[in-house]
Amino acid sequence: MSTYGKVYLVSGNKGKLAEVQSYLAHANIVVEAVKFDLPETQNSSAEKISWDKAVEAYRVVNKMPVGEPLRHGGTPVLVDDTSLEFDALCGLPGPYIKWFLDRLGVEGLLKMVKGFAAPGEKDSGAAAPAHRGANAVCIISLCHGVEEATGQPLVEQFRGVCRGALPPVPRGGVGFGWDSIFAPEAQTPAYAKTFAEMSVEEKNTLSHRAKALKMLTEYLKTHALELRGTKLVA
């Protein structure tokens, strides 16, 4: 059986780190956080934004000078990007949710969809009015080296989606970010709790990040031989 090593998660968010560590611990992967600012590509594609960040993170973590070709054999890095897509706004804020949250706060985000209710539509947290529908999306990008023949970065991406709805008001006191304004559909009863009202164990069974982490873990297990020679698989 392969021995899994260490990977760096580029994040200063302790809540996010705890979620990633909790999940990957089952695969014997040690996750350590490194914190530094990464430039964000201005692009409507969350996958493109995450891909660019993962490549730059690999360069920074492995101290490879800007302008020089990336080298193989460095320490692998993970970049985790989330999007929150409001049905009423045709997918916005999407990958720009961090900036919307910083400027507006969770209550301001809820106000963005308030005027989209259909005439006579009941605004209830128990149901899911059409104007409150939303998708939580997580893109995890793993940069684990460079294709030596072409010089192209080796980046694998894993996309997890959780369908849910926005409650009329923020609910719950745990979690982080916008957890208090997203209630997943895949619970009984549907939309009963926001992420901020769930235990870590509950959240890790159905969240967008959990789905992406599951795909990442399966990839690491099935591609262990290919990853030998990197610092991720010894």
Swiss-Prot record:
<feature type="binding site">
    <location>
        <position position="98"/>
    </location>
    <ligand>
        <name>ITP</name>
    </ligand>
</feature>
<keyword id="KW-0479">Metal-binding</keyword>
<protein>
    <recommendedName>
        <fullName>Inosine triphosphate pyrophosphatase</fullName>
        <ecNumber>3.6.1.66</ecNumber>
    </recommendedName>
</protein>
<dbReference type="GO" id="GO:0036220">
    <property type="term" value="F:ITP diphosphatase activity"/>
</dbReference>
<dbReference type="GO" id="GO:0009117">
    <property type="term" value="P:nucleotide metabolic process"/>
</dbReference>
<feature type="binding site">
    <location>
        <begin position="11"/>
        <end position="16"/>
    </location>
    <ligand>
        <name>ITP</name>
    </ligand>
</feature>
<comment type="similarity">
    <text>Belongs to the HAM1 NTPase family.</text>
</comment>
<keyword id="KW-0378">Hydrolase</keyword>
<feature type="binding site">
    <location>
        <position position="53"/>
    </location>
    <ligand>
        <name>ITP</name>
    </ligand>
</feature>
<dbReference type="InterPro" id="IPR002637">
    <property type="entry name" value="RdgB/HAM1"/>
</dbReference>
<dbReference type="GO" id="GO:0047429">
    <property type="term" value="F:nucleoside triphosphate diphosphatase activity"/>
</dbReference>
<keyword id="KW-0546">Nucleotide metabolism</keyword>
<dbReference type="GO" id="GO:0035870">
    <property type="term" value="F:dITP diphosphatase activity"/>
</dbReference>
<dbReference type="GO" id="GO:0046872">
    <property type="term" value="F:metal ion binding"/>
</dbReference>
<dbReference type="GO" id="GO:0000166">
    <property type="term" value="F:nucleotide binding"/>
</dbReference>
<feature type="binding site">
    <location>
        <begin position="208"/>
        <end position="209"/>
    </location>
    <ligand>
        <name>ITP</name>
    </ligand>
</feature>
<dbReference type="GO" id="GO:0009204">
    <property type="term" value="P:deoxyribonucleoside triphosphate catabolic process"/>
</dbReference>
<dbReference type="GO" id="GO:0005737">
    <property type="term" value="C:cytoplasm"/>
</dbReference>
<dbReference type="GO" id="GO:0009143">
    <property type="term" value="P:nucleoside triphosphate catabolic process"/>
</dbReference>
<dbReference type="InterPro" id="IPR027502">
    <property type="entry name" value="ITPase"/>
</dbReference>
<keyword id="KW-0460">Magnesium</keyword>
<keyword id="KW-0547">Nucleotide-binding</keyword>
<keyword id="KW-0464">Manganese</keyword>
<feature type="binding site">
    <location>
        <begin position="81"/>
        <end position="82"/>
    </location>
    <ligand>
        <name>ITP</name>
    </ligand>
</feature>
<keyword id="KW-0963">Cytoplasm</keyword>
<dbReference type="InterPro" id="IPR029001">
    <property type="entry name" value="ITPase-like_fam"/>
</dbReference>
<dbReference type="Pfam" id="PF01725">
    <property type="entry name" value="Ham1p_like"/>
</dbReference>
<comment type="subunit">
    <text>Homodimer.</text>
</comment>
<feature type="binding site">
    <location>
        <position position="40"/>
    </location>
    <ligand>
        <name>Mg(2+)</name>
    </ligand>
</feature>
<feature type="binding site">
    <location>
        <begin position="176"/>
        <end position="179"/>
    </location>
    <ligand>
        <name>ITP</name>
    </ligand>
</feature>
<feature type="binding site">
    <location>
        <position position="203"/>
    </location>
    <ligand>
        <name>ITP</name>
    </ligand>
</feature>
<dbReference type="GO" id="GO:0036222">
    <property type="term" value="F:XTP diphosphatase activity"/>
</dbReference>
<comment type="function">
    <text>Pyrophosphatase that hydrolyzes non-canonical purine nucleotides such as inosine triphosphate (ITP), deoxyinosine triphosphate (dITP) or xanthosine 5'-triphosphate (XTP) to their respective monophosphate derivatives. The enzyme does not distinguish between the deoxy- and ribose forms. Probably excludes non-canonical purines from RNA and DNA precursor pools, thus preventing their incorporation into RNA and DNA and avoiding chromosomal lesions.</text>
</comment>
